[in-house]
UniProtKB/Swiss-Prot annotation:
Residues 1-37, 1703-1745, 1753-1767, 1786-1797 have a biased composition (Polar residues). It comes from Homo sapiens (Human). This is Fanconi anemia group M protein. The modification Phosphoserine is found at residues 34, 1673-1674. It is linked to Spermatogenic failure 28: An autosomal recessive infertility disorder caused by spermatogenesis defects that result in oligoasthenospermia or non-obstructive azoospermia. Premature ovarian failure 15: An ovarian disorder defined as the cessation of ovarian function under the age of 40 years. It is characterized by oligomenorrhea or amenorrhea, in the presence of elevated levels of serum gonadotropins and low estradiol. Its main location: nucleus. InterPro entries: DEAD/DEAH_box_helicase_dom, ERCC4_domain, FANCM-MHF-bd, FANCM/Mph1-like_ID, FANCM_DEXDc, Helicase_ATP-bd, Helicase_C-like, P-loop_NTPase. One of its GO terms (molecular function) is 3'-5' DNA helicase activity. Residues 98-266 form the Helicase ATP-binding domain. Residues 1518-1538 have a biased composition (Acidic residues).
């Protein structure tokens, strides 16, 4: 190439980044510079001059390029003077002629394969590449291999720089493709990628100048080629199209369709007979062989025809099938007849007859398909097809039954089965059976064509070998055989495989098409082609997959086993040969029909060529093909020899990166862009550089993995030996095995679960490698096999005995564990094994290195076999984990003198178990040590990787039992002694500890390292002794009944809490054997307990995971002993916990000054199961330090609250119960939360389980009291009054120890954040998201019953974030309880007959009004106990209103049945969202009634006089749980009941969630008539006039409306206002209540008139209520208390505006409130706190906003100065206007200061909001799935309407047109299909949770070409669905086509734009904000546009998390209520154990 030409490249290619591949350099004409020349230094001045010249040239190039874009469409006149044709390839005249023609007109080039279509394409592409420097050239091919081939051709033919070319396929990421479109000029891609990029707007359509389409004959119908052209035309007509194909089409119509779709202006056609190509084409001999049917095949054919007649005759008799000869009918004709019958059914055929005819059609179609197989492929293919029908794999049940009744068919089928049954099984084995070539078994030729094919192939190889004597030549020949069906491909391959090694055959098929068929993956296909091309195989049997698109090399013989009707298929097959040498084509046809098909195909081919070449009038060409070259310019031909470099295929990025590091010095300059040493230290880097770094001298250019072995590609023995290629190093998978049996050190990224599993396998392999004979591991495990545990449905293979995550462990049989338990206990609570299996599935136990340990103790096992018989059933929990179980037995059975053997190995066992044991049904591995244990056993380790170096490193104490599981360390009597000295040390250290704050995060790593070196164990950790576990003792078993609830997942699979990052070990060893026999405890120990004043461990398994569903194993008959305690100060842990009492075995290793991840208390199930005692909170002083660590948690002993004064008494084992509790004082600045356990407040408390068959007063003389947590969980040290505890229990009940455990030294694990501590935490602390164990503090210990305690779980089920379907959860709870009580004959249903039960309210354990103090809390406030009020309660359910599941005196714990209905907060003009769980859509699916109303049943009428106090108690307790996260309109059930009319209340459709008898129902009704607010007088509704509006059509939506059925629970509301007037509903947005209440829609005018009226009358109706709130609880209570109880002094004139704003906000859909059930309340600063109160309690003042066109309303002025009005054009959702802040709290002590601070804070937020600009273009977001189904909609919006359309992952949404509106597009056929109805409804409900407005566009189905138009028939299902949608508030629009849909979308978006709610934020998120966007999208019920708003409006996630409700509402452009949801979610403090395992580990590691 000339220098001038290179300059053109450099000039016009400057828009590309000019790196190594500039156009000039890459053209191949320049010589590369020598390395020396590049090193020559230039003078500084000259260098600067060169740089400045380059800059000037670059600017000039860009300027010229910009000018060119404006002139002549970007055509370069200087370059356009010539068009270049390469001479480096032989010049062929036909190619030159076609290339010239294609430059100036859209051309279809038809050339036989192998004659240079690719060359012509390269020439045309190169010239357009030159002519249009700023344009794009696009090549499209249907398959990836063709795309890749064309890139290489363009480079090798024309020298187009590789740096300017790019390949894009579906595997390329969309974001990457967008960058490629901008940076590259010549693009090679598949058509679907092009369609996607055009739809996404990534492709610059206007810049495309040349479009080349390969395999153009595919451009039929709506193929992607056609879509691309249609889309491009919408943007520009100025582009050239070049279409390439070997054949134009199968017939004239197809050719015309291709011409029309691709805008073809001319055809360049060359056939094999054309004179100008004869000289260039090799001779291809086509032989047609006609094979007659044999006698056997003819006989079977005759029988088969008789079967066909019997089935087709009935269709012919009914006149639905044409009368023709049965043998001449075809499958296609029957299909056409069936379609005709469906379109025009006969009037005589109705009802069931129509179904019968359809079935007969289906049978006939199947039989005729078999007939064609028989004729073409033979008997075997027919048999395989019939087998699929008869064995049911094809799912044709009716056909199977009908054929089975036909005698002739069964005879034929049995005959075929005898012939081919063996081959059927062989074929099922897949392709691998081919290579075996079993010559012993005779091959059955199912068709005569097979013999002919065999003859042809053998003859070919014989003749070839005769002609080519050399071995190399013999291997060069290739044979390819084509067949249409896989079965015949398999048959041919099996036949030819008998002729090995002459014939090396392989099959080649496509991907798997179904479950039963196994195809080739793409990798396998490429591997087969590669081996075929390289000589691994010489014969390839292929389906149509091999016809086109793959470079299979030169083939000498092509055999077509069947004929193809389409000439295209035949031409493609024939094109595989004759490319480089003479080829031969053999077509084997059966006599008769197949021969006729072939002849017809050849005739069609000839007619097409004749029509195109001779009579051009037949085809209509595109007449407006652009010339592309400006007028006056006629490019002249310039032949040029183009040289090019070596084509380098594109490598994966990782290879390029590695090469760059290997060859970094190649050009003499080091690549400084790479970091020198990465993460290596200087010494490590030197070591790596010296030993491991690959250099050029190593001559290693590539590192490869071992050859992939495919199961389907065998025959490896014949594979030629791989020549060792120099410079290629193959990695080995085995050379590093010596390092793979233990985890190596890690940095930042820990080992994965998969890695640890692999390590465990390697350990076991290594251990078993040296064994001979029997496996020791198997022998060890075998002795523990319980045959009762083995079910017939599952027997685990031996090699899976370690698979603890087995999903198949499900048994319904009573296990040995249950049997053994029942033998030694009077009563038990056992979960079913099936429930256990649910947990086993969730656990992931990693293999442990215990083999060596087991060997050492195997002898002891045998010796202690008898002892073990009695107890191992308890320890061997029902599971399939042999490791942990065996380990426990080993340790138990060891004699005391042998337990200390080999400390290091035992430690090693624990080491491997670190972070490993997660099996809920297994006792964990327990290790024991003597006093001689080294200090290393208590040390902390920096990284878990080092822990595994058992031989080199010391073992850390955090490996000993660091589990969330209960750890049963059973001890013997001889191991017991007291440790009084520890008591003093503990108490002294505790006080010292409390003087510190937790260390900062930055200092923890150093501290941890020091602790790891210096901390020592000072005491012993003893192992259980089996001798003292006797079955005659009673076992204290705890029930874990919440098995099936969704809460089992909350603390995900018993996650180990002691991670490598948490450096201290915190143990909890429950001891539950302290009671008498009826309480399932050991009797002897119980006597000792009484002497010691010790009580049963009440929080036995506090930290047990909720997934645990087996009974709690306990320590039995054990005495206490010394416990290892870490004693350290700063560098060491403080000794804070004491274990003196003889019955408790606690290990307290809690270095509280280091990072300590304790075992947190599971508040969801464990607490529900076993009432907690002595849980406490550390006071706020400990939380105020800014350096408080996120994971710091406090592990407290249950005795640890004893004061320093108690020390001496403690040492003497005080006998007095009262002293133990009375002596507690402010040692820990901790106050015990003493509260009511009233039935109303047991939403928040955990009730103690006691004997249900006895009066509950009969307990020990110990009374405990716990203040209810109405504040932020401050806890006071209280005098704990003793109460009695009954020693005698009745057998058959479940007893769970209670208050005695208050003294149990088994400490309770609580996170530092403690239970529900949100509201009063420090501002600095509020930013932490610590795991919170909720309801831990509310633990009444007195007077409850078993059922209440267990039914607590039902409440918990409904409170978890996961529970969105309460009904299901209730059922699960019921099942869980019933299964729990199965073996104790005590179930929920049986409870009513369980004898007299006295249900004592536990809320009166303290006198009302008692003052409780928090000595060292933040403000030393005085708590005033709430006193009884005579004032009535507005709620209907003041008592313990539990809807019992049965008519039982035992009422389950009260729980809201439905998510909180914040109907006060309904949005401005939406009520689409369903506020009730059972919305009308759900009713439409599953139920008949409307949404259930939560009517609560009073438990007892005797407490009616206390309703007001009860309501306050209930609300106070609610505040602790939901706090600020719920709005003030809390009680949706009572709200709807109280103010609605009688008719509304007596809604017949109301469904109660539980059964209630008539008397109870009447009680509910009578109670509802009275108002507690008016001293139980009757409630009166004073109605005013009704505003009845009559509409002639559906009114348009109002911007502001009042939600239907919403009744304000405010005394301040106007009593004269009727409930009908309160509800203003847009008919298009009606909720499910509307139909029941018959509410009427009000126009904007009516609403405004009503507002004016109410403002005039509001003053007289005003009534204020005032209560005294406790200071500490005021912050929470005012956020949740109903306004009638609070003292909100609202100006009467503002009431209506408050109400209006209530409805200007959205209501929560049913599923979205589940998360709010268990919210905690972190303390926030006063500004945020006050703003939250304002947002929750007082609604903003907003004016009306117009709907479809702007209307100016008068601004409603408020009479109160602080009020602000907003212009009517501004959306209410964006402007939460503050009202009088002080009105939220009448108490001047809190309201005054916060009011003054809050107002400016809110004002600042208003000013910071950026209003959208009116002039900005309208934007619509489109879901990615719409690219395929709604392409024309997208293109019309973008190209025709000029809207900004962005394709985004919208999470199932179709179109988002504004911040609040989503549009779903559905076709009529989808709406008609009742199968999809439920799915569609679920989709709508999903959208309702995210958007305020929903619109559904019902689009008419597109008519396919040639289809007759059918009239649309409405169905009942269709109409009912539309009705339901309208009733649910969904707007329905109808469209006739996609273009009209685009018009509707445009109108909707413009309407939303006018209302100022359009999309105005950038839709593209840069890389640094993409993670924030993903985080926002992870928030439940957050739409993509909301996340996008938050991403752009908030500078960071931290900024959003610290924002107030108003800010979130404004910036996220959401309603106030949606902002509440977001706020609650962000501030919800949850237990990290709820995270999945990997996330939990990653989170903990990331916090290091």
């Amino acid at each position: 190439m000339s220098g001038r030409q290179r300059t053109l490249f450099q000039t016009w290619g400057s828009s590309i980044s000019r790196s190594s591949g500039t156009p000039g350099c890459s053209s191949g004409t320049e010589r590369p510079q020598s390395p020396g020349s590049s090193k020559a230094p230039l003078p500084a001045a000259a260098e600067a001059q060169l740089e400045s010249d380059d800059d000037v040239l670059l600017v000039a190039a860009y300027e010229a390029e910009r000018q060119l874009c404006l002139e002549n469409g970007g055509f370069c006149t200087s370059a356009g003077a010539l068009w270049i044709y390469p001479t480096n390839c032989p010049v062929r005249d036909y190619q030159l002629h076609i290339s010239r023609a294609a430059l100036f007109c859209n051309t279809l080039v038809c050339l036989p394969t192998g004659l240079g279509k690719t060359f012509i394409a390269a020439v045309v592409m190169y010239n357009f590449y030159r002519w249009f420097p700023s344009g794009k050239v696009v090549f499209m091919a249907p398959t990836k291999p063709l795309v890749t081939q064309q890139i290489e051709a363009c480079y090798q033919v024309m020298g187009i720089p590789q740096s300017h070319m790019a390949e894009m396929t579906g595997s390329t990421q969309a974001s990457t493709r967008k960058e490629i479109w901008c940076s590259k000029r010549v693009l090679f891609l598949t058509p679907q990628v092009m369609v996607n990029d055009l739809s996404r707007g990534a492709c610059p359509a206007a810049e495309i100048k040349c479009l080349v389409i390969d395999e153009a004959h595919k451009a039929l119908g709506n193929y992607a080629y056609c879509q691309v052209v249609r889309e491009l035309v919408k943007y520009t007509n100025h582009f050239r199209i070049l279409a390439l194909s070997a054949t134009p089409g199968s017939d004239i119509k197809a050719v015309q369709q291709v011409i029309t779709n691709l805008l073809i202006g001319q055809i360049e056609l060359r056939s094999e007979d054309s004179p100008d190509i004869l000289t260039y084409s090799h001779e291809r001999k086509v032989e047609k062989l006609i094979v007659p049917l044999g006698e056997e095949l003819a006989a079977i054919q005759k029988t088969y025809i008789q079967i066909l007649e019997s089935f087709a005759r009935s269709l012919i008799q009914r006149n639905v099938l044409m009368r023709r000869d049965i043998p001449n009918l075809t499958k296609y004709q029957i299909i056409l007849a069936r379609d005709q019958f469906r379109k025009n059914p006969s009037p005589n055929i109705v009802g069931i007859q129509q179904g019968i005819i359809e079935g007969e059609f289906a049978i006939c179609i199947s039989l005729y398909h078999g007939y064609e197989l028989l004729q073409q492929m033979g008997m075997r293919s027919l048999y395989f097809f019939l087998c699929g029908i008869m064995d049911g794999t094809k799912g044709m049940t009716r056909s199977k039954n009908e054929l089975g009744r036909n005698e002739d068919f069964m005879k034929l089928y049995n005959h075929l089965e005898c012939m081919f049954a063996r081959t059927r099984s062989t074929s099922a084995n897949g392709i691998s059976a081919i290579q075996q070539g079993d010559k012993n078994k005779k091959f059955v030729y199912s068709h005569p064509k097979l013999k002919k094919l065999e003859e042809v192939v053998i003859e070919h190889f014989k003749s070839w070998n005769a002609e080519n004597t050399t071995e190399k030549k013999r291997d060069e020949t290739r044979v390819m055989i084509f067949s249409s069906f896989r079965d015949s491909v398999q048959e041919i391959a099996e036949m030819l495989s008998q002729h090995q090694p002459i014939i090396r055959v392989m099959t080649f098929v496509g991907h798997a098409s179904g479950k039963s068929t196994k195809g080739f993956t793409q990798k396998e296909q490429l591997e087969v082609v590669k081996q075929f091309r390289d000589g691994g195989y010489n014969t390839l049997v292929s389906t149509c997959v091999g016809e086109e698109g793959l470079d299979i090399g030169e083939v000498d013989l092509i055999i077509c086993f069947d004929s193809q009707k389409s000439p295209i298929r035949l031409v493609q097959r024939m094109g595989r040969t004759g490319r480089k040498r003479q080829g031969r084509i053999v077509i084997i046809l059966s006599e008769g029909r197949e021969e006729r098909i072939y002849n017809q195909s050849q005739s069609n081919k000839r007619s097409i060529y004749k029509a195109i070449s001779s009579n051009r009038q037949v085809l209509h060409f595109y007449q407006r093909s652009p010339r592309m070259v400006p007028d006056g310019i006629n490019p002249k031909l310039h032949k040029m020899f183009i040289t090019h470099g070596v084509y380098e295929p594109e490598k994966p990025s990782r290879n390029l990166q590695r090469k760059s590091s290997i060859f970094s010095y190649r050009d003499g300059m080091r690549q400084s862009s790479l970091k020198k040493d990465w993460f290596l230290s200087e010494e490590e880097f030197k070591l790596w550089n010296r030993l491991y770094r690959l250099r050029d001298s190593d001559e290693i250019k590539e590192i490869t993995l071992p050859q992939v072995q495919f199961s389907s590609l065998q025959n490896e023995e014949n594979k030629p030996a791989q020549e060792s290629t120099t410079g290629i190093h193959q990695l080995s998978l085995s050379e590093w095995r010596l390092w793979q049996d233990h985890p190596l050190p890690t940095h930042q990224v820990d080992h994965s679960d998969r890695c640890r599993h692999f390590i465990g396998l390697m350990q076991m392999i290594e251990g078993m490698r040296h064994e001979e004979g029997e496996c020791s591991y198997e022998l060890e495990v075998e002795s523990y096999l319980q045959m009762e545990d083995v079910t017939s449905t599952f027997i685990a293979p031996r090699n899976e005995s370690n698979n603890l995550a087995s999903d198949t462990f499900i048994t319904h049989k009573k296990s040995s564990f249950i049997k053994n338990i029942n033998q030694g206990s009077s009563s038990s609570v056992i979960e079913s094994d099936e429930e256990c299996a649910e947990i086993v599935k969730q656990t992931h136990i990693k293999p442990t290195k215990i083999v060596s340990l087991k060997k050492k103790v195997s002898k002891e096992i045998k010796k202690d076999q008898l002892k073990k018989e009695n107890n191992h059933g308890i320890i061997d929990s029902v599971d399939n984990d042999r490791n942990s179980t065996v380990e426990n037995i080993f340790q138990e059975d060891l004699p005391n003198d042998k337990r200390t053997s080999d400390t290091d190995e035992i430690a090693a066992t624990c080491t491997i178990n670190e972070n490993v044991i997660k099996e809920p049904c297994v006792l964990l591995t327990e290790c024991q040590f003597t006093n001689k244990s080294t200090s290393s056993l208590a040390g902390n380790v920096l990284d878990s990787g080092y822990n595994s170096f058992n031989d080199e490193k010391s073992v850390s104490s955090n490996l000993f039992l660091p589990f969330e599981e209960e750890l049963y360390i059973v001890r013997t009597d001889d191991q017991f002694y007291n440790c009084h000295s520890l008591t003093k040390e503990v108490l002294a250290n505790v006080e010292r500890f409390l003087s510190y704050s937790p260390p900062p995060l930055s200092g923890l790593s150093d501290l941890e390292y020091e602790i790891a070196k210096g901390t020592a164990l000072e005491n012993l950790l003893f192992l259980p002794c089996a001798e003292h576990l006797r079955s005659d003792k009673c076992t204290c078993l705890l029930s874990h009944s919440a098995v099936n609830s969704q809460q089992n997942l909350e603390l995900n699979s018993l996650k180990c809490i002691n991670y490598p990052s948490e450096k201290s070990c915190l143990y909890d060893i429950p001891n539950d054997n302290i009671s008498d026999e009826p309480s399932l405890c050991d009797c002897d120990v119980h006597k000792h307990n009484q002497n010691e004043n010790l009580v049963p461990n009440n929080r036995v398994q506090i930290h047990r995971s909720p997934a645990q569903n087996l009974v709690g194993e306990n320590n039995h008959d054990v005495d206490n002993s010394d416990l290892p305690v870490l004693s350290t100060d700063q560098d060491e842990s403080l000794l804070l916990f004491e274990d003196v009492n003889t019955e408790f075995d606690d290990v307290s290793l809690s270095p509280l000054n280091s990072k300590s991840e304790s075992l947190p208390v599971s508040d969801k199930t464990a607490i529900s199961e076993t009432p907690l005692v002595s849980q406490f909170l550390i006071s706020d002083e400990l939380l105020l330090d800014n350096n408080s660590e996120l994971q710091d948690q406090i592990t407290r002993d249950a005795n640890s609250f004893k004061s320093r004064d108690q020390r001496g008494v403690q040492e003497e084992k005080v006998k007095n119960h009262e002293d133990i509790f009375d002596c507690s004082r402010d040692l820990f600045s901790v106050t015990f939360d003493l509260g009511f356990c009233s039935p109303d407040s047991d939403d928040e408390i955990l009730e103690h389980t006691s004997d249900s068959n006895r009066p509950l007063d009969d307990l020990y003389g110990r009374y405990l009291e716990i203040k209810e947590i109405s504040d932020a969980n401050y806890v006071s040290n209280q005098a704990l009054i003793p109460r009695d505890h009954s020693k005698n229990f009745t057998s058959g009940t479940v007893i769970i120890p209670s208050n005695e455990d208050m003294q149990n030294p088994n400490y309770v694990h609580l996170p530092l954040s403690a239970a529900k501590n949100e509201e009063l935490l420090s501002p600095g602390y509020s930013q932490f998201s610590l795991p919170v164990q909720k309801k831990v503090m509310s633990t009444p210990l007195s007077k409850s019953n078993t059922l209440n305690s267990f039914s607590k779980i039902r409440k918990e089920i409904l409170k978890t974030p996961d529970s969105s379907k309460e009904k299901v959860n209730l059922q699960r709870f019921k099942e869980a309880l019933n299964s729990t009580f199965d073996y104790s004959e005590f179930s929920l249903e049986k409870s009513k007959s369980s004898g007299p039960m006295y249900l004592h309210k536990s809320c009166h354990s303290v006198e009302d009004g008692q003052l409780l103090t928090s000595n060292e809390s933040e403000d030393d406030e005085i708590f005033r106990r709430k006193v009884k009020r005579a004032k009535g309660n507005v709620l209907n359910s003041p008592e313990d209103q539990k809807n019992s599941e049965v008519d039982s005196p035992l009422h389950a714990v009260k729980k809201r049945r439905f998510p909180i209905n914040r109907s006060e907060l309904s949005s401005s003009d939406e009520s689409e969202n369903f506020p009730k769980p059972c919305s009308q859509l759900e009713d439409f699916k599953v139920c008949n009634g409307n949404a259930r109303r939560g009517i609560k049943v009073p438990k007892r009428q005797s407490h009616l006089k206390h309703v007001a106090r009860k309501f306050l108690d209930d609300e106070a307790e609610l505040s602790e749980e939901d706090a600020e996260y719920v709005s003030s309109d809390e009680n949706d059930e009572s709200e709807n009941e109280q103010d609605s009319s009688l008719l509304d209340f007596l809604n017949d459709e109301t469904q109660l969630s539980q059964a209630i008898n008539d008397s109870e129902m009447r009680a509910i009704y009578m109670k509802s008539l009275r108002s507690p607010m008016m001293n139980n007088k009757y409630k009166m509704i004073h109605k005013t006039h009704k505003n009845i509006n009559i509409f002639s059509q559906i009114p348009e939506q109002d911007e502001t409306y009042l939600e239907d059925s919403f009744c304000v629970d405010e005394e301040e509301s106007c009593k004269g206002q009727s409930s009908e007037e309160e509800v203003c509903v847009d008919f298009n947005l009606i909720t499910d209540d509307c139909f029941a209440n018959s509410k009427k829609y009000k126009t904007r005018r009516a609403v405004m008139l009503k507002e004016m009226m109410e403002q005039n009358c509001a003053h007289s109706k005003k009534k204020l209520s005032r209560i005294i709130l406790p200071d500490d609880s005021s912050e929470e209570e005012n956020n949740v208390n109903d306004k009638r109880e609070s003292n909100i002094a609202v100006n009467p004139s503002t009431v209506k505006k408050n109400k209006q704003q209530d409805h200007c906000l959205n209501s929560v859909p049913s599923g979205s409130s589940a998360q709010s059930k268990v919210r905690s309340t972190p303390r926030v600063n006063p500004l945020a706190k006050q703003s939250k109160q304002t947002s929750l309690n007082l609604k903003d003042t907003i004016s009306e906003v117009s709907d479809f066109k702007p209307q100016n309303h008068n601004e409603v002025q408020s009479t109160t100065p602080p009020f602000t009005t907003v212009d009517s054009q501004k959306d209410c959702r964006k402007f939460p206007v503050p009202q009088k802040d002080g009105s939220a709290l009448e108490d001047s002590s809190t309201s005054g200061a916060s009011c003054s601070k809050s107002r400016p804070h809110l004002a600042g937020t208003h000013t910071s909001l950026r209003l959208p600009q009116e002039g900005k273009g309208t934007c619509i977001l489109v879901g990615g799935h719409e690219i395929t189904s709604g392409l024309e909609v997208i293109s019309s919006l973008r190209a025709i309407h000029g809207l900004q359309v962005e394709v985004c992952p919208l999470n199932g949404c179709d179109y988002i047109v504004s911040n609040r509106m989503v549009v779903e597009r559905r076709s009529q056929s989808e709406m008609l299909n009742s199968v999809n109805k439920n799915k569609f409804i679920e989709q709508i409900q999903h959208l309702q949770s995210m958007f305020e407005r929903i619109c559904v566009i019902v689009e008419k189905d597109r008519e396919k070409t040639g289809d007759t138009s059918r009239m649309f028939r409405r169905t009942k299902s269709y109409d009912s669905l539309l009705t339901t949608l309208i009733g649910a508030g969904i707007r329905i629009l109808f469209s006739s086509c996609q273009e009209e849909t685009a018009d509707l979308l445009k109108e909707l978006s413009l309407v939303e734009q006018r209302k100022n709610v359009g999309i105005h934020v950038p839709t593209v998120v840069n890389s640094n904000k993409s993670e924030a966007l993903q985080f926002y999208l992870s928030i439940p019920n957050i739409s993509y546009i909301t996340a996008l708003n938050m991403c752009h409006q908030f500078s960071s996630v931290k900024r959003m998390a610290n924002s107030s409700l108003q800010e979130i509402s404004m910036y996220a452009q959401v309603t106030h209520q949606k902002a509440e949801e977001i706020y609650r979610y962000i501030h919800y403090v949850f237990d990290i154990q709820m995270l999945p395992n990997d996330l939990n580990q990653d989170r903990l590691k990331s916090d290091i």
